[in-house]
Regions:
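Short glycine/proline-centered loop/turn elements that form peptide/ligand docking sites
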Residues: 40-44
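A structural detector for beta-sheet-dominated domains
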Residues: 15-17, 49, 56, 72
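Short, charged/polar surface micro-motifs in flexible loops or helix N-caps
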Residues: 52, 60-63, 72-76
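Vicinal oxygen chelate
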Residues: 1-7, 38, 49-57, 79-105
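Compositionally biased, intrinsically disordered low-complexity regions enriched
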Residues: 12-14, 33, 37
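Amphipathic alpha-helical segments
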Residues: 19-34, 76-85
Length: 105
């Protein structure tokens, strides 16, 4: 049987024009859906509502944003997606201290 990755949605990243727009969007989302702005996940690049909606403080990867996925076997999942015609940006790779790939776009 063919390998199928066990993808899990980690978060949805939404590109905003700037920090002010990210704050406004996060606030509106909080009002609409009762998902509080999450200061624990705040960074120089993004603001979160809850744990799964990331409001980018400047345009990031993708035209509108990105979907962050996790999988137990990243190398196998990468091969699976490449076989389906998807490509990756080698310059985007971030590694764990032991050399394993942590993130790739």
């Amino acid at each position: 049987m063919a390998y199928t990755p066990d993808f899990e949605l980690v978060h949805i990243g939404v590109n905003c024009a700037d920090e002010a727009q990210a704050a406004e969007c996060a606030h509106k989302f909080e009002l609409l859906f009762q998902l509080a702005v999450n200061p624990a996940k705040e960074s120089a690049d993004a603001r979160f509502t809850g744990t799964q909606i990331e409001w980018m403080k400047k345009p990031g990867r993708g035209e509108h944003g990105h979907l962050a996925l996790a999988t137990a076997d990243l190398p196998a999942a990468r091969r699976y997606l490449e076989e389906k015609g998807f490509s990756f940006d080698e310059e985007s790779i971030k590694h764990f201290s032991d050399g394993r790939v942590l993130v790739i776009y």
